[in-house]
């Protein structure tokens, strides 16, 4: 088995941006779940919403194609903990073609489609002219965005198999590293809040009217949230070069 090094990692969720808020929340028992106030959703439930995403602006050269909540969440996470600098250093060290991108997502930027659907033409059903399927709803959008954001040209893939997505992304990255196809891999998962997920799980009677308590004998449902987490993997021989 080819040794692989975990060189950097970061995460962003309702707990905060970067690893420090995660550690603090675990140590203090703090929850980031809040009563749902997402978009126009009227549900008696709690959600894990990342604050401030509506105000995040993608770089000018990428905004017209990739602007959506999912990619704004991805960029927010990538810029925490100095992670983006680590990726750029590896791209310079190995070359952009030797850094792969392997990500997991389930709903990607479907929120943009949901909002566009509300604004469709009443007669023809045509979606708004500024709706961008490629850069939003398309599951590959998040990997496409990450590659453009860092100027990477190595192999890229997105896995969309619900809860197993990110685990499979790590497995795919490990195989590419083991075969010597790449020297480093940007791996992770991004999923943002959307109407389909919130209303869907609520329709199944699975959402709790309070913050979820997974290990409580009297637990009464789940809480839906959003988050992004990334890891930078390297072949040990490359990392030690």
What would you call each of these model-derived segments?
Residues 155-162:
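Short loop-beta-helix segment that forms the pyridoxal 5′-phosphate
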Residues 1-155, 194, 202-223, 229-231, ...:
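Conserved "HGTGT" condensation-loop signature of ketosynthase/thiolase-family condensing enzymes
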Residues 147-151, 174-181:
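Alpha-helix C-terminal capping segments
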Residues 166:
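Short conserved active-site loop signatures built around small residues
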Residues 169:
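Active-site histidine-anchored catalytic micro-motif
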Residues 96, 182-183:
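Short, high-confidence coil segments that cap the C-terminus of an alpha-helix
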Residues 184, 189-194:
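Glycine-rich anion/phosphate-binding loop at the beta-strand->alpha-helix junction
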């Amino acid at each position: 088995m080819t040794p692989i090094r975990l060189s950097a990692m970061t995460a962003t969720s309702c707990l905060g941006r970067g690893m420090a808020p995660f550690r603090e929340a675990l140590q203090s028992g703090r929850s980031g779940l809040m009563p749902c106030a997402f978009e126009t959703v009227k549900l008696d439930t709690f959600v894990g919403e990342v604050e401030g995403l509506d105000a995040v602006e993608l770089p000018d050269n990428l905004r017209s194609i990739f602007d959506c909540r999912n990619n704004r969440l991805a960029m927010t996470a990538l810029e925490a903990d100095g992670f983006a600098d680590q990726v750029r250093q590896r791209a310079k060290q190995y070359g952009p073609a030797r850094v792969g991108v392997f990500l997991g997502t389930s709903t990607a930027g479907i929120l943009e489609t949901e909002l566009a659907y509300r604004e469709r033409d009443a007669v023809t059903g045509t979606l708004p002219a500024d709706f961008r399927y490629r850069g939003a709803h398309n599951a590959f959008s998040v990997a496409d965005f990450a590659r453009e954001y860092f100027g990477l040209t190595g192999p890229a893939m997105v896995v969309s198999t619900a809860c197993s997505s990110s685990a499979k992304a790590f497995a795919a990255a490990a195989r590419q590293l083991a075969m010597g196809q790449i020297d480093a891999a940007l791996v992770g998962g991004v999923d943002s809040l959307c109407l389909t997920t919130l209303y869907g799980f609520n329709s199944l009677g699975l959402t709790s009217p309070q913050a979820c308590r997974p290990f409580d004998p009297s637990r009464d449902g789940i809480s839906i949230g959003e988050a992004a987490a990334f890891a930078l993997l390297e072949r040990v021989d490359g990392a030690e070069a």
